[in-house]
Amino acid sequence: MPSPEEQLARLVEAGFTLQTFERFPRSLGVLKGDCIALVEPTPEGLTLIGTPGWRMGEVMGVLVTKGGRQVFQAKGQTLEATPERVEALARFRAELESFL
């Protein structure tokens, strides 16, 4: 298993962007396009924390069903989960998981 440092280097080479968050000092944001996920370094390598979501300003919107339709929701904000956004998030997750 590659070290977290090697995994991060490979993610950057693949076009992902890394970001730290004060509220989550032990984790690191991994972004590509409008998609975002939190990862945490462990002795076994990087581990995905929770579910990837859609970046909505400085917060991550999670995919939920509200009022019978899918939306990304974060702190009272909602964003329509169009088929294109849902597909982009699925591609992001699959690509990210291939590095973890």
Q: Residue locations for each model-derived region?
A:
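Negatively charged, low-complexity tracts enriched in Asp/Glu with abundant Ser/Thr
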Residues: 1-33
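N-terminal non-globular leader segments, chiefly Sec-dependent signal peptides
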Residues: 2-4, 70-100
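Phenylalanine-focused residue identity feature
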Residues: 16, 21-24, 54, 72, ...
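Generic local-structure boundary detector
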Residues: 22, 27-29, 39-41, 57-61, ...
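Proline-rich intrinsically disordered, low-complexity coils
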Residues: 2-4, 25, 41-43, 52, ...
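Generic structural motif recognizing short loop/turn segments at the entrances and edges of beta-strands
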Residues: 14, 26, 33-35, 44-46, ...
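Intrinsically disordered, low-complexity regulatory segments enriched in Ser/Thr/Pro
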Residues: 37-79
